[in-house]
Amino acid sequence: MSTLLEKTRKVNRILQKTGIQPVDFNEMANILKDVIEANVYILSRKGKVLGYSILKDYGNDIFAQSKIIPEEYNDKLLRVTETLANDKGNLFKEDKVLSDLILTIVPVNGGGDRLGTLALSRGVKEFTDDDLILAEYGATVVGLEILRSKNEEIEDEARKRAVVQMALGTLSYSELEAIKNIFEELNGKEGLLVASKIADKVGITRSVIVNALRKFESAGIIESRSLGMKGTHIRVLNDKLLEELEKMKR
């Protein structure tokens, strides 16, 4: 049987991957399932099931069957502000499956905020102090990974916005007017562009439109495909483009 130290080291390996591989909450849940020997569910603050791993199937399990758990379930989880150990039939009295299981609920916190919930379930055997130590350590690791995931998302959003702003900055006045009218005409993330129609509307040459599109395509903001006489199919690859163009209207 693995000792508490050996189990803690297994959980710690998750941290060793931080920054090297994308966050995989299913893998994290699987490791916690193995060391704690329980069903494990990792949920976001809004009740989205980020990852889970099943040791034993107990039937109609709301945590495993839903991408987002019902709001009333999540509200109950969020009201748990410190580890709730070995709950049986109190937290989810109305749920026939969960009320028959032994549940341990561990809040996931980070940066002073509630980030989510780590939920564990068993059929008969209660969670020991060692199990709770591993669960709380696991919740800390989950919190760090959620924070990292959020930071990566923020950085990616900032990078995409910067690329769009730089590309817009390279446009001449005529090219900028062409871009504004192109995406006003598309009215979405993709569609068919008839360059001559835009040229006549704005009072510019087709070459101005072509140059503007080339700049955006080389920046990886859009992709275009000629359909001959029908026009050009445009697809937005960077969703920050539409946001930045919308700001210009204000």
Swiss-Prot record:
GO terms for biological process: negative regulation of DNA-templated transcription. SUPFAM superfamilies: Winged helix' DNA-binding domain. Pfam families: CodY, HTH_CodY. Residues 1-147 are annotated as: GAF domain. Keywords: Cytoplasm, DNA-binding, Repressor, Transcription, Transcription regulation. Residues 195-214 bind DNA. GO terms for cellular component: cytoplasm. It is found in: Cytoplasm. GO terms for molecular function: DNA binding; DNA-binding transcription factor activity; GTP binding. DNA-binding global transcriptional regulator which is involved in the adaptive response to starvation and acts by directly or indirectly controlling the expression of numerous genes in response to nutrient availability. During rapid exponential growth, CodY is highly active and represses genes whose products allow adaptation to nutrient depletion. HAMAP family: HTH_type_CodY. Belongs to the CodY family. This is Global transcriptional regulator CodY. The lineage of its organism: Bacteria, Bacillati, Bacillota, Clostridia, Thermoanaerobacterales.
